[in-house]
Amino acid sequence: MSFNRPPNGVYYIRSAVELRAFVNLLKKFKGYATTLITLYINAERPIPDVVNLLRSEWSTAANIKDKTTRTHVQDTLERIINNLKGEAKAPENGMAVFAGFHMINQGNYEWVYYVVIPPQPINTFKYICDTAFHTELLEDQLHAGVVYGIVVIERGEAVIALLKGGQWEVVKSVEFFVPGKHHAGGQSANRFKRQTEHLAEAFYKMVAEEANKIFLQIPTLKGIIVAGPGPTKEDFLEEGGLDYRLKDKILAIVPACCANEYGVMEAIRNAQEQLKESEYVKAKEVMDKVMYYAVKKSEYLVYGRERALKALEMGIADIIVIAEELGEDAVLEVIMKAEEKGIKVEVVPRGVEESKTLMQAFGGYVALLSTPVWVLEQQLSIAEAAQR
């Protein structure tokens, strides 16, 4: 089967969204018998050692009885060796090589060679010959992305949420009766105050227990945001008994209106600086920039597929912004063309509010330009005139 794909080459993948699109592409390729080679090289593995191993595999492949399989495997190994020769070591995050002859149909083959530099380190060395490429180690990076914990707490109510990739969700709500302040005087007031403090402390311990249970099970937990109105959040940290390992991960204590979904959104907004590695916050920052250009620098912005890709083709785009919702083919098309021109791409993940804005207001494509839009308009007019 034949399909559109990026040209063979080296691809530096910067985000989980781009990685997801590339993984889905790699899964489409099929080899004749076990002729597709997957090679994962961690940064610590010397490339000369890898080349020696591949030469040994080339010699072993000479014993394969089927001529097509033997030819494809040896040819693929030879090409990988030639590309790796002269290199001393892999990049800091390692590299994944996917190479071989994709079977379009019986007797009709297409050479495929991709080197993927992933956003997170490859920690092992693997060499695999199979009928398909093995993407498991790359997929592990998708599942093991950075996770942030969020606790929003007010008097008698709390929510615990997780922020992962481009999405967040409330995973636990806690409610407990804690009376309001009592204004009467005397002994009864003092007794009431002590009872209220006791109930508040019991509530904080309940919330801490739930937070400990949830957060300690997440090995990729990057940090925790604690939020809420007034001093309740500080009282919770002081009296609740949050596990010391989690206390060490607290990135920020920020104000938030209330212990519900609106409070979670406000907590994320108020802790943007601490959450800057999150896809959710990155998407918001990208779309904030797009909206700034749309309002203040509209002469340096174009949108829609045709105009954005034309700006990319002409090399006058500083940044291309595309919605993941458009599909992997569209995303890979932009990544491929931008790689050739050295232009930065920002992929807004599906599921975030900013993706809806990008799709509905801009058709899923935006180009932020290095030159005024009239330069692009002039080129489009010339192209239209030439077609008449």
From Swiss-Prot:
GO molecular function term, any single one: sequence-specific mRNA binding
Cellular localization per UniProt: Cytoplasm
Keyword NAD: no
Keywords: Cytoplasm, Protein biosynthesis
Protein biosynthesis among keywords: yes
InterPro entries, per database record: eFR1_2_sf, eRF1_1_Pelota, eRF1_1_sf, eRF1_2, eRF1_3, Peptide_chain-rel_aRF1, Peptide_chain-rel_eRF1/aRF1, Ribosomal_eL30-like_sf
GO cellular component: cytosol; translation release factor complex
Assembly and interaction partners: Heterodimer of two subunits, one of which binds GTP.
Functional summary from the UniProt entry: Directs the termination of nascent peptide synthesis (translation) in response to the termination codons UAA, UAG and UGA.
NCBIfam families with a match to the protein in the record: aRF1_eRF1 (TIGR03676)
Similarity comment: family membership: Belongs to the eukaryotic release factor 1 family.
This protein's name: Peptide chain release factor subunit 1
Protein source organism: Pyrobaculum aerophilum (strain ATCC 51768 / DSM 7523 / JCM 9630 / CIP 104966 / NBRC 100827 / IM2)
